[in-house]
């Protein structure tokens, strides 16, 4: 288990959805389509000459080492060095990302954060994932004048119909408990 105790869950939803989107487009197999080794310099020179629209006055020499220059001075690496982070993680399809995000990550949220609901929204998160938004109590914050009101403030998520009862229970009890007890079933032993 790994907890991000500050920052809420909205950023995690964005990261998760973004990675799912990128996984389909930027996996190793698809990235091969953009591998500079696969560029046909002869064909590219022909296209520049044909469609250069006055910017190219003659057909470029595809054998000129300056003809094809990569942005930022990028060089053509060996094929063996081309890799993608998702492939290195063993992600074969976008659905595999759910198994990384859903079971092991916990996202600490403040009581008054309306974006807590994003973590529980199966319609919003790809593949129906529920990211573990958890009540990371802001009782000790300098801007909380009365610590007895924090949980009631969190309950406003139900009153505003941002969370249902089950999600609220997961938010304030189940997920914070799981964070510790899932790794150590005796974590709370002797506390009651």
PLM region descriptions:
Residues 10-11, 50-98, 103-132, 141-192:
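Mid-to-C-terminal alpha-helical segments outside catalytic/metal-binding sites
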């Amino acid at each position: 288990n790994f907890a991000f105790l500050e920052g809420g869950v909205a950023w995690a939803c964005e990261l998760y959805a973004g990675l799912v989107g990128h996984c389909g487009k930027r996996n190793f197999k698809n990235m091969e389509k953009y591998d500079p080794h696969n560029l046909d310099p002869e064909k590219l020179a022909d296209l520049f000459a044909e469609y250069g629209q006055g910017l190219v006055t003659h057909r470029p020499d595809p054998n000129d080492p300056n003809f094809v220059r990569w942005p930022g001075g990028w060089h053509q690496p060996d094929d063996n060095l081309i890799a993608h982070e998702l492939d290195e993680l063993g992600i074969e399809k976008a659905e595999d990302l759910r198994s990384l995000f859903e079971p092991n990550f916990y996202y600490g949220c403040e009581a008054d954060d309306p974006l807590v609901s994003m973590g529980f929204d199966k319609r919003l998160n790809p593949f129906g994932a529920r990211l573990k938004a958890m009540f990371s109590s802001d009782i000790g914050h300098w801007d909380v004048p009365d610590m007895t009101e924090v949980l009631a403030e969190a309950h406003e998520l139900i009153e505003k119909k941002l969370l249902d009862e089950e999600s609220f229970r997961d938010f304030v009890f189940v997920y914070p408990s799981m964070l510790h007890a899932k790794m150590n079933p005796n974590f709370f032993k002797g506390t009651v």
